[in-house]
Amino acid sequence: RICRAAFREATRRRGKVTLVDKSNILPSMAFFRRIFDEISEEFNEIESERIYIDAAALYLVKQPGRFDVIVTENLFGDILSDLAAGLVGGMGMAPSADIGEKHAVFQPSHGSAPDIAGQGMANPVAAILSTVMMLDWLGAETQRGATLIQEAVQTVLADSGNRTHDLGGSLSTTEMGDAIIAAIKSSSSGQ
């Protein structure tokens, strides 16, 4: 199911699925690779590739744009998602989605961050970008909202003074959220 879901997702995106495994070391992954190859034949219009986890980590750092949809098992997915979060500024910047056939859950990659709960230090960007992902997933009728929020986040982050503690700044959770809300209001009133 996961391979088929990855290929279906690629039809809505740039049209490429990358299988990440370590089938040269872990024999159980050869089965996963075989299933991937079988499913890829059902989606001739989608480019597919298979790479090992160590190469995937290198490419994610050096050439992140080469990826569109990555399908892998949980262990490697956890490692790659944390690496990707680091590339965009940290866990406070990384949205997350668990997407099923009919339902989906969207949340920040960092979870609830209980170690800083109630201190006003959490970066709200991951939660806000998770909302963008949800609106994208919901479809065309919510696309304008997703774009508006995404652009507001980009506008706020373009100002180097807008940084929360995790990014070396001093803005609180509320201050960062308020800055993004102000950018949304400014953008939507100008349209």
Predicted segments with their positions:
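Glycine-rich phosphate/diphosphate-binding loop of Rossmann-like nucleotide-binding domains
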Residues: R1-D54
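A broad detector of short, well-ordered amphipathic alpha-helices
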Residues: R4, R8, V125-L129, E175
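Short glycine/threonine-rich loop-to-helix capping motif typified by GTGT followed
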Residues: P27-D37, V61-F67, A85, A158-R163, ...
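Active-site nucleophile and cofactor-binding loops and adjacent substrate-binding regions
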Residues: Y52-I53, G120-A122, G169
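A glycine- and small/hydrophobic-rich beta-loop-beta segment
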Residues: I53, K62-Q63, F67, S186-Q191
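Glycine-rich phosphate/nucleotide-binding loop
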Residues: L60-S160
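Internal helix-turn-beta structural module
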Residues: W137-Q191
